[in-house]
Amino acid sequence: MKRIAIILAAAVMTACGVQLPVAGDAPSRTQERFSEMVVRSEMQRFPQATWLDGLEGTLKWNYTTGLELKAFMDVYEIARIAPYHHNDKAIFDYVESWYDAVIDGNGTIYNYKKSNFSTDHICPGRTLFQLYDLTGKRKYRAAMDVLFDQLMDQPRTPEGGFWHKQIYPNQMWLDGLYMAQPFYAEYAARYVSDPSLRKAIYADICHQFVTVYRNTWDWQTGLLRHAWDASLESFWCDPITGQSQHAWGRAMGWYCMALVDVIELLPSGDERTELATLLQEIYHALPRYADPATGMWYQVLDCPGREGNYLEATASAMFVYAWLKGVRLGVLAGLDEARAAYHSLLSTFVTEEGGIVTLHRCCEVAGLGGKNNRSGDYDYYINERVRDNDPKGIGPLIWAALEYERL
């Protein structure tokens, strides 16, 4: 961690017109926190949640909208407790209106198909825990039961890892750990009453993380490759290891966020300890691949400084969020460095004009195989579209801000 401490100590400490709060100073009831500022910026850009992620009013059960609305809901819930005591119903209504539109009175989820066995479709279910707590609407609980039922039947690799999707047989992508495991853990903690079954689920969750770590780990870098094909049949994978070619920044960011979110949910014990160890190993390797000038991370994580590579906002926001939260949970060291990383995240990627926050340099999408035969080589990753305010960056930016504001 020494190298990144030096890097981040030299980073710019104020962010392009964004007024940063001072750690430990509680905002007044009328003072807007940065996390709220980001939420309001998005709500002003997109007055209805069906317009998030470029969907232009299309109703769709998708992880990107669900991810961002989960962050909105976290801002809403934290604002309601001390020291803020602020009930911002506009945020709640914005979130609830989308979920009420996409889930009918019986708990049927619009355009959801269990037979797709997509881990992406589990992710939007996380906000349902909060909505159910706040409203008591049975349809939210029914929808959660549907998603949990999918996980009970999710196809698995020979080692027991969840397939990423039905269309990607025997493949585990780092993305999928975030999509499924936090929901899996929270459902078990809340609703699985049988202690033996709950314990078995916790063990299964740990197994998912360990399996994908073991099979995507690159011994030369200490980083994790984007994905692994247990069958060794995909054109994009190494014929011996099954690994994809590169460590993609956001893929590792998903994995780190999944770790801290699940660690927070697990009771003390072997599984929590093992997941904490995985997180610590990652944060031992990450500083070596940070940009020396900013401390932020590249689109293709294992090729820092290579021609065409660029500092990428979504991955950097995910790493900063997971670092701050890991420190709060007592499983990562480096509070001062994590705080500096947050400042650098804002100074590198965030601008503000007229109270509207913009997050720049977000990779829109990246994957492997599929109908576009995505190869996962270096040129593929650096040539995917880059845009502002991608939900996969906005959500982690909000969570990083919330963690910083709790210091």
Model region roles, listed by residue range:
Residues 39, 72, 128, 148, ...:
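Extracytoplasmic/secreted envelope proteins and their assembly/folding machinery
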Residues 9-10, 27-66, 78-81, 85-92, ...:
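CBM-like carbohydrate-recognition segments
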Residues 1-26:
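Bacterial Sec-dependent N-terminal signal peptides
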Residues 93, 102-238, 373-374:
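Extended ligand-binding groove/face enriched in aromatic
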Residues 75-79, 263-266:
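Secondary-structure edge/capping motif, primarily at the C-terminal ends of alpha-helices
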Residues 174-175, 181-302, 309-320, 332-378:
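Extended ligand-binding clefts on enzyme/binding-domain cores
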